[in-house]
Structure formats: structure tokens, C-alpha cells
């Protein structure tokens, strides 16, 4: 590769906003405007196609690089409590999520890092909420 050559960024998928079945396949940490965690999920859209989407949340790390338990009001804490109800937040092993099937609320990511609306051509789908398949208590299921 020549010096100064740009590597193209893969386009992020976009599907209709709604609730879909998904399966968590992996997770990873990433630093961009603060430390983030990505819960990577295979979502099955209305046509039966498998789309790779992520649940993205901010996290805090100790000096040793370990995740600090999220606040109870955070979207990460709510997701972990719903998917791993018998595990204390301080004891969460994110590897326990891998292989879990869940319901995923998918919405368009419309804002940039400055909270300004991006041009529509730059919108992409992201998972905003995740719940167990068998759990029908959540309001968002009635939105569609």
C-alpha cells in the first residue's frame, strides 16, 4: 500500500426502523469520543436476510482496562439486566451474551458527534434496545 492511501470505510447497513429478532455474535471495545462497547448482532430483516448491526454504548474503564459497572439508568445496564437477569452488574461477563437470541429495536442513526442531523445519505441502522425473545412486557414492541 502506498503512503497516504486511504482505506475505504465499509458502508454501514440501513434497514427499516422496527423490532427484529437477532443473535449476539461478538463484542468489542473501541475508542471514539470516549470508550465505547459494541455488541455485534446478526439481525434478520423482513425479507429473511441476515444483517450485521451493533448495539453501541459508552463505558468507563479502570486503570487496568476493566469495565466499570454501568449506572442502572444507562441503556447498557438496562440491556444487560434484561438479557442476563440473574447476574449482578459487577459480575457481568460479556462473553455470556454471545449466542443469545433476542429482540432488537433498530433505529436510524441520524445525528453526528456534535448532535447535529447528518445528511440522509449518511444515516445508518443501529440497535437501540435489546430484550429476551420471550419477554413481551416492553412498550417498544407495540410501536410498530
Walk through the language-model features, giving the residues of each:
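Short beta-rich binding modules
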Residues: 1-144
Amino acid at each position: 500500500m502506498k503512503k497516504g492511501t486511504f482505506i475505504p470505510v465499509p458502508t454501514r447497513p440501513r434497514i427499516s426502523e422496527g423490532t427484529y429478532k437477532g443473535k449476539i455474535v461478538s463484542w468489542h471495545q473501541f475508542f471514539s469520543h470516549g470508550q465505547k462497547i459494541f455488541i455485534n448482532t446478526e439481525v434478520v430483516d423482513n425479507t429473511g436476510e441476515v444483517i450485521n448491526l451493533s448495539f453501541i454504548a459508552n463505558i468507563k474503564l479502570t486503570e487496568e482496562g476493566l469495565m466499570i459497572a454501568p449506572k442502572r439508568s444507562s441503556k447498557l445496564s438496562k440491556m444487560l439486566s434484561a438479557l442476563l437477569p440473574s447476574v449482578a452488574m459487577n459480575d457481568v461477563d460479556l462473553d455470556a451474551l454471545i449466542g443469545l437470541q433476542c429482540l432488537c429495536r433498530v433505529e436510524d442513526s441520524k445525528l453526528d458527534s456534535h448532535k447535529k442531523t447528518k445528511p440522509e445519505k449518511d444515516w445508518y441502522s443501529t440497535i437501540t434496545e435489546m430484550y429476551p425473545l420471550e419477554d413481551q412486557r416492553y412498550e417498544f414492541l407495540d410501536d410498530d
